[in-house]
Amino acid sequence: MKKILLFIFFTFGILVASEYRALEDKSIVYKDKNGNGKIDYIALFKATDELYIYARAYPLKFKDEEQKKAAFSDLLKVEKIFEFMDSEGFSKSLGGQEGEYFKICQARLHVIKHNFDVQGEAKKADKIYGELINLTPDNGEIYAEFADFLANSNRIDLAEQNYDKALNLGVKRANLGLALVKLARMDQKGALPHLEEYLKSYADDEFAKILANSIKEGTLKVEP
């Protein structure tokens, strides 16, 4: 079998470059029938999610430079809305899952800005993820998402710690993160059990299948 050359970017699955849909300002900020300004926070969350899909990890997944520029412009607009909501105390009126997701979106905006090479954003993301973990220490998904960012920003030891915590809290996808951490350390033997466990829950993940089969066949070459 032909040798497989793997460049580890710590992206989970392979996202083919596709058309980024530019932000529609009016869908988030609008006026009601009485002329009062309103913010649709659900639309705001969705806009953040859309940006995060394309820029959650490096390299960015935009189709071309034009889309990348449009997305960065949208990012700054979305960030301003979040800052306004925070400054006016609107964010505090959101309780439960909505309030938690507001903070998750704030952390993701800093992750995105970091991946756009904006200085100082990693520390800001770290701070908010730390706050989220303190608020919801039993939420394994927060640990896993934070670990994804730590891995993508080349902080392997911290990433491993958070993947372990996520896995202990039942987040099965953390096995893939742990496998990639092992591969980053050139430990194929240590990566394989995590890949096999991951595939028990995500049997259709072709990326993980290729990695596992290549390790078993001794044909995987890893270059960090």
Which role fits each region the language model picked out?
Residues 37-65, 94-114, 141:
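Amphipathic alpha-helical repeat scaffolds of TPR domains
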Residues 35-42, 190-224:
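Terminal, low-structured helical/coil segments at or just beyond the last alpha-helical repeat
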Residues 99-177, 181-184:
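Alpha-helical adaptor scaffolds
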Residues 81-100, 131-136:
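Flexible helix-coil transition and linker loops at the boundaries of alpha-helical arrays
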